[in-house]
């Protein structure tokens, strides 16, 4: 496989392992996101990834989980709690860039 370059780091079969930390939507504010990014930088992670979605685009308000341990919360309510605003995404992206770590997002729906 041919190597590719991600933010000045070669990635490929003959290159050192490229580590990506999944931070998903595990943060609710900028301070929590900074802590996660700082931890990733401290242990030598190459990139962090979060998730971009809006509850309205992936479920309905009347859609419930089909599992016993989820209680009575709807999928919409749960996903709504996990949304990350565009403003917070920009703050987090700017901070990651300043810290020198690659950041990207996995969009749920386009």
Describe each PLM feature range:
Residues 11-12, 41, 94-98:
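Acidic (Asp/Glu)-rich catalytic clusters
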Residues 19-23, 48-50, 103-105:
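Hydrophobic faces of well-ordered beta-strands that scaffold small-molecule active sites
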Residues 46-83:
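Glycine-rich, proline-tolerant flexible connector loops at the mouths of alpha/beta enzymes
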